[in-house]
Amino acid sequence: MVDVASVRQHVGTKPHRAPQMIDFDNKGFFKLKQNDEYAERVKSLLLDGEQVIDAYKSMRDGVVFTTKRIIAVNVQGITGSKKDFTSLPYKNIVAYSVETSGTFDLDSELEIYFSSLGKVRFEFTGRTSMVEVSKHISRHLF
């Protein structure tokens, strides 16, 4: 799941038709499952020296953790050929929280607080290990 308490502004868009960007205000849940499909989809967006740490997919959307940022992918339209890629740089993270899976609750959660953006929350299915992602976020905080 992804949710944030603020609204992104659309710069340079036509007033009668705003682009369909990721809705960080939507409180709806979607569960992310580890999947390399989105790692391939964002390769052309990666900077020199930037590498994929892990990639996750929900029903249509995806999230990719790289060495420099989080890239959220919003698949749009009936055919899914149109996509919005939102870059969330680690350098803007002020705090984060990880909830690991338990004995009966197999899901885990990652809440990240971005300066001037608010909270972004990701929910993962199964026994997803957040160790590498957590370590990488911590490296950018300290």
Specify the residue positions occupied by each region the protein language model found.
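Anionic N-terminal interaction surfaces
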Residues: 7, 11-63, 119, 127-132, ...
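Charged, low-complexity, helix/coiled-coil-prone segments
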Residues: 28-42, 71-85, 139
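Short, intrinsically disordered, mixed-charge
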Residues: 47, 95-98, 138-142
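Phosphoinositide-binding peripheral membrane targeting modules
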Residues: 51-62, 66-107
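Canonical pleckstrin homology
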Residues: 99-127
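C-terminal output/interaction extensions
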Residues: 133-137
